[in-house]
């Protein structure tokens, strides 16, 4: 069992949802509505099982901005940092015993069928 050494709780994992927005844009309104309902049900199931800590879908990539601060000056560009086939579309913050368990949980996230889920363990920062 992977217990966070700082908090003493189960580990937290950020599950980043990626998919090709062109695939989503090609869906019929009924397919899109069905996918959204599946995502809501998935979140509800994860929450009732005590694994869901938070999450949300993101607006399309054309609404994004990237900020870089160089020499104390902000530089903003439209869009994401890098152009890729799959775009960051949402996230789930989950709590699980270990990586194996969170992989099983993330496999139930509906957009995993359409793209990918990147799973990242959370590193808790603690004040001195």
Identify the residue ranges that each predicted region occupies.
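Conserved, structured core segments of small domains
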Residues: 2-128
